[in-house]
C-alpha cells in the first residue's frame, strides 16, 4: 500500500453497509497511516436503485477519518449493477462514469505529487 500512488476501492452494499471484511482491512490500515493524503477513489454498486449509496457514504466517512485524499468527484455509485454490467462491459453510461472517475483520480494523483 505504501508504494501505491493511489487506491481504488470498489464495494457492494450489504445490509446498508460495507462488508465486514472491507471494514476490517481498513481498520488494520488506520494505525499504519498509509492512506494519509493518499489519492483514493471509491465505488459502490448494488442491484437496487440506491446503487450502494449508503455503503459509499459509510466508506467515504471512514476514508476521510483516515485522512485519505477523497474528493467528491472520486466517488461513484452504480445502481442496478446486475442489469448494467455485461461480460463485455457494454453499459455506456457506466463506462462514461468510470472514465470520469478515473480522470478525477488522475487529477488527484497529480495534485498530490505536486504537494509532496
Q: Where do the model's predicted regions map?
A:
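Glycine-rich phosphate/pyrophosphate-binding loop and the adjoining helix
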Residues: 69-116
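Helix-loop-strand module that forms the ligand-binding subsite of alpha/beta enzymes
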Residues: 1-67
Amino acid at each position: 500500500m505504501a508504494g501505491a500512488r493511489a487506491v481504488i476501492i470498489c464495494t457492494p452494499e450489504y445490509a446498508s453497509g460495507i462488508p465486514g471484511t472491507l471494514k476490517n482491512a481498513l481498520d488494520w490500515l488506520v494505525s499504519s497511516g498509509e492512506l494519509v493524503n493518499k489519492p483514493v477513489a471509491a465505488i459502490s454498486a448494488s442491484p437496487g436503485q440506491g446503487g450502494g449509496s449508503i455503503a459509499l457514504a459509510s466508506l467515504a466517512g471512514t476514508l476521510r477519518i483516515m485522512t485519505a485524499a477523497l474528493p467528491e468527484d472520486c466517488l461513484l455509485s452504480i445502481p442496478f449493477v446486475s442489469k448494467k454490467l455485461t461480460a463485455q462491459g457494454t453499459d455506456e453510461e457506466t463506462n462514461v462514469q468510470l472514465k470520469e472517475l478515473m480522470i478525477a483520480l488522475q487529477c488527484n494523483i497529480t495534485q498530490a505529487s505536486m504537494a509532496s
